[in-house]
UniProtKB/Swiss-Prot annotation:
Record note on quaternary structure: Proposed to be monomeric or homodimeric in nucleotide-free form and to oligomerize upon binding to ATP to form two stacked hexameric or heptameric rings with a central pore through which ESCRT-III substrates are translocated in an ATP-dependent manner. Interacts with CHMP1A, CHMP1B, CHMP2A, CHMP2B, CHMP3, CHMP4A, CHMP4B, CHMP4C and CHMP6. Interacts with VPS4B; the interaction suggests a heteromeric assembly with VPS4B. Interacts with SPAST. Interacts with IST1. Interacts with ZFYVE19/ANCHR; leading to retain it at midbody.
Entry similarity comment: Belongs to the AAA ATPase family.
Name of the featured protein: Vacuolar protein sorting-associated protein 4A
GO biological process, one term: autophagy
Residues that coordinate or bind ATP: 167-174
Subcellular localization(s) per the UniProt record: Late endosome membrane; Midbody; Cytoplasm, Cytoskeleton, Spindle
One term under GO cellular component: ATPase complex
Annotated source species: Mus musculus
Length: 437
């Protein structure tokens, strides 16, 4: 924002006052709240003298007080048929007697958060996750066992309530969370990001955090998965905004605060930069599991998983050679290599100048073999017909299978995305605070 922030706040308050006098209370409330945000920004970045700051702060309190009265009035309008609220008169104690379930604001926030509930299971099983056996066992211990054998977790033996998955990008942290959502059949799975919990309205973000945890407690057993948790819970410092500080405080209170019973609720966080997490947040993640770059055996399994049922002629020796050549690559990097190699046959079809007739399965009925399919070939090949892919009928193309040379070509053009410096930082964090997976 520029130096016109204070003027913008004054303009908004002027409009809010006009709407207030015209008894358009909903619009007035919105404008008051918006104006307060601009005033707060002006206090922080534009007002240089203490006297100016104090003057703006006093005005802020006045408009906030009016906004609260309007909010209470609107909340109780339908139920109690209240008369328009006077500027210097409070609403009385009608709102105190409201039950939580009848609170329309709370209901609206909870409906907004219900969009974070994963209703359809992702269909990713533990077997689909290559390697990471330690992380899988820890998640089974925290999620699956308490649901299946609740009698095991009584007395002092309680399941973990906070698990942090950290490691370089592309190592499978979010993929593991999808596997948890699939395998935890009876759990409600909330998948939230910073955008689900951030609001431009003053005070609404922390209410969203509080309501998220209340929803999770209502639907337990439940799992709250927060991807890129560092964007919400970074270290507290004097340069951060007041809103960010309040969100962090609410997270701390809800995860392990007085009066909050989180039995049956697991908070699962994932981050690539764990060293920026606030120390109090880090403590609340009782298990901190390092998700490293995949080892050779896991990389070989990844190549097999990503190739799937696509036609190829790679042998086990080829797969192990590829695994050896991809030291330092993440699971996401390997996925990109395989996807690119699967496109190589398509590129051969596009660039081919000659095709030849071959025998292969029919497109309409794979059990029937036909001998008039066309596949790309070199110009010197016996039976080569000069034509381009545009001349090939749609149901007569037999694409080449993926071969080792396709894989090596894709590998040569794909570099690992994990930076050596970041890897050292993650390993240092793991040595200080983590646990090997």
């Amino acid at each position: 924002m520029t130096t016109s922030t204070l003027q913008k706040a004054i303009d908004l308050v002027t409009k809010a006052t006009e709407e207030d006098k015209a008894k358009n209370y909903e619009e007035a409330l919105r404008l008051y709240q918006h104006a307060v945000e601009y005033f707060l920004h002006a206090i922080k970045y534009e007002a240089h003298s203490d006297k100016a700051k104090e003057s703006i702060r006093a005005k802020c309190m006045q408009y906030l007080d009016r906004a609260e009265k309007l909010k209470d009035y609107l909340r109780n309008k339908e139920k109690h048929g209240k008369k328009p609220v006077k500027e210097n008169q409070s609403e009385g104690k009608g709102s105190d007697s409201d039950s939580e379930g009848d609170n329309p604001e709370k209901k609206k926030l909870q409906e907004q958060l219900m969009g974070a509930v994963v209703m359809e299971k992702p269909n990713i099983r533990w077997n689909d996750v290559a390697g990471l056996e330690g992380a899988k066992e820890a998640l089974k211990e925290a999620v699956i066992l308490p649901i299946k054998f609740p009698h095991l977790f009584t007395g002092k033996r309680t399941p973990w309530r906070g698990i942090l998955l950290f490691g370089p990008p592309g190592t499978g942290k979010s993929y593991l969370a999808k596997a948890v959502a699939t395998e935890a059949n009876n759990s409600t799975f909330f998948s939230v990001s910073s955008s689900d919990l951030m609001s431009k309205w003053l005070g609404e973000s922390e209410k969203l955090v509080k309501n998220l945890f209340e929803l999770a407690r209502q639907h337990k057993p439940s799992i709250i998965f927060i991807d890129e948790v560092d964007s919400l819970c970074g270290s507290r410092n004097e340069n951060e905004s007041e809103a960010a500080r309040r969100i962090k405080t609410e997270f701390l209170v809800q995860m392990q605060g007085v009066g909050n019973n989180n039995d049956g609720t697991l908070v699962l966080g994932a981050t690539n930069i764990p060293w920026v997490l606030d120390s109090a947040i880090r403590r609340r993640f009782e298990k901190r599991i390092y998700i490293p770059l995949p080892e050779e055996a896991a990389r070989a399994q990844m190549f097999r998983l990503h190739l799937g049922s696509t036609p190829h002629n790679l042998t086990d020796a080829n797969i192990h050679e590829l695994a050896r050549k991809t030291e330092g690559y993440s699971g996401a990097d390997i996925s990109i290599i395989v996807r690119d190699s699967l496109m190589q046959p398509v590129r051969k079809v596009q660039s081919a100048t000659h095709f030849k007739k071959v025998c292969g399965p029919s497109r309409t009925n794979p059990s029937v073999m036909i001998d008039d399919l066309l596949t790309p070939c070199s110009p010197g090949d016996p039976g080569a017909i000069e034509m381009t892919w545009m001349d090939v009928p749609g149901d007569k193309l037999l694409e080449p299978v993926v071969c080792m040379s396709d894989m090596l070509r894709s590998l040569a053009t794909t570099r690992p995305t994990v930076n050596a410096d970041d890897l050292l930082k993650v390993k240092k964090f793991s040595e200080d605070f983590g646990q090997e997976s």
